[in-house]
């Protein structure tokens, strides 16, 4: 059996990139300051990097799945060009009130459900207890709880933080950029 690895599960909009609302074009995709360096450092620390993103804009007819895939490929290559190799990219195109019939459904992949995280766990042999979920919304924290992710990290770079989201999180950080240092500080043995 393959050895399990710890992972950093990453929401996309508001965590990796600025959330301009239904981001689906390269021209509107803006990496948040410091996140690329942080992702590179997290890889060096031995974490798998896994993007788990709700993309209801597909179901809502705001953009097509092909447009999302083109942007995702560009993001993946942009990160790879900066020595950040993602281990997985999982997305949910569904929404129960979607206008595109093919994607209008209740599913187990849309956060707060844990489907994307569990799929990644099974495929990549992830040690969930040693992993982190980083996101900007309550649904990210709820998905992490449902998937038994060890540490839930809420970031201030996306949607305004709600009291419910803050209560569900283990840590609240200003940005994903702060995560490597926070993990190192936590892992430091007591003197």
Swiss-Prot record:
Pathway: Nucleotide-sugar biosynthesis; ADP-L-glycero-beta-D-manno-heptose biosynthesis; ADP-L-glycero-beta-D-manno-heptose from D-glycero-beta-D-manno-heptose 7-phosphate: step 2/4; Bacterial outer membrane biogenesis; LPS core biosynthesis. Zn(2+) binds at residues 92, 94, 107, 109. Transmembrane segments: none annotated. Magnesium. Can also use other divalent metal cations as manganese and cobalt. Substrate binds at residues 11-13, 19-22, 53-56, 110-111, 137. Changing residue 92 to A: Reduces the catalytic efficiencies towards the alpha and beta-anomers of HBP. Gene3D superfamilies: HAD superfamily/HAD-like (3.40.50.1000). Changing residue 109 to A: Reduces the catalytic efficiencies towards the alpha and beta-anomers of HBP. GO terms for biological process: ADP-L-glycero-beta-D-manno-heptose biosynthetic process; lipopolysaccharide core region biosynthetic process. Keywords: Carbohydrate metabolism, Cytoplasm, Hydrolase, Lipopolysaccharide biosynthesis, Magnesium, Metal-binding, Zinc. Signal peptide: none annotated. Optimum pH is between 6 and 7.5. The record marks 110 as: Contributes to substrate recognition. One of its GO terms (cellular component) is cytosol. It catalyses: D-glycero-beta-D-manno-heptose 1,7-bisphosphate + H2O = D-glycero-beta-D-manno-heptose 1-phosphate + phosphate. Mg(2+) binds at residues 11, 13, 136-137. Phosphatase activity is essential for nucleotide activation (fourth step). Zinc ion does not directly participate in catalysis, but probably functions to stabilize the loop conformation. This is D-glycero-beta-D-manno-heptose-1,7-bisphosphate 7-phosphatase. The lineage of its organism: Bacteria, Pseudomonadati, Pseudomonadota, Gammaproteobacteria, Enterobacterales.
